[in-house]
UniProtKB/Swiss-Prot annotation:
It is found in: Cytoplasm. Disulfide bonds: none annotated. The lineage of its organism: Bacteria, Pseudomonadati, Thermodesulfobacteriota, Desulfuromonadia, Geobacterales. This is Elongation factor Ts. Keywords: Cytoplasm, Elongation factor, Protein biosynthesis. It comes from Citrifermentans bemidjiense (strain ATCC BAA-1014 / DSM 16622 / JCM 12645 / Bem) (Geobacter bemidjiensis). One of its GO terms (cellular component) is cytoplasm. It comes from the Bacteria. Its main location: cytoplasm. SUPFAM superfamilies: Elongation factor Ts (EF-Ts), dimerisation domain, UBA-like.
Length: 216
């Protein structure tokens, strides 16, 4: 059966699992919402669902400075208690997220933060490209949905493929960490700084250097 975007979004809101994980769960369970939740729980991807409503107001502002001081990242990750904020696993998660941001250069934490005008501009570009193919309107809209999801996966931190484990997204990594630690967590915001950004300088692929360092 065909799984709709509405079904995926509903399951995502209920469990906090990643979009692709939700789609797979619905596909495996024939579109049954409750069975899909159980499927995600067996995979350890929805263990955070019962914790999702709890306030995460403690946490840590972590940092990562790439070798040579050419790239720097600050990221705020929240948790429920100061006790967990001092936990080595939590602090390790924050460091890993900062390193990922340095390598992958997301622009937003989640898709809800992406300005509507930017989304519409991207849709217009994809729609025009699809029209040139001569495909039916219904097919074009399906292609458009796929292209926009790829767009979000490129620029939204939670939907990016984790640089240290290409088999999972940052959302999945977050869910697994929540399940392991036992508290709700949230990646609130981040900032990335590149030495000399905006100034005339010799070209150098700093992001590739960071990615290589992360993979070590």
């Amino acid at each position: 059966m065909s799984i709709t975007a509405a079904q995926v979004n509903e399951l995502r809101k209920a469990t906090g699992a990643g979009l692709m994980d939700c789609k797979k769960a619905l596909t495996e369970t024939g579109g049954d919402h409750e069975k899909a939740i159980d499927y995600l729980r067996t995979k350890g991807l929805a263990a955070a669902s019962k914790k999702a409503g709890r306030a995460a107001t403690e946490g840590l502002v972590g940092s990562y400075i790439h070798a040579g001081g050419k790239i720097g990242v600050l990221v705020e990750v929240n948790c429920e208690t100061d006790f967990v904020a001092k936990n080595e696993n939590f602090q390790g998660f924050v460091k890993d997220i900062a390193m990922h941001i340095a390598a992958a250069s997301p622009l937003y934490v989640r898709r809800e933060e992406v300005p509507a005008e930017l989304i519409e501009r991207e849709k217009a570009i994809y729609r025009e490209k699809a029209k040139e193919s001569g495909k039916p309107a219904a097919i074009i809209e399906k292609i458009l949905d796929g292209q926009i999801n790829k767009f979000f996966a490129d620029i939204c931190l939670l939907e990016q493929t984790y640089v240290k484990d290409p088999d999972k997204t940052i959302q999945t990594f977050l869910n697994e960490t929540i399940a392991s630690i036992g508290e709700n967590m949230s990646i609130r915001r981040f900032a990335k700084f590149v030495l000399g950004e905006g100034l005339a300088k010799k070209e150098s692929d700093f992001a590739a250097e960071v990615a290589a360092a992360v993979g070590q």
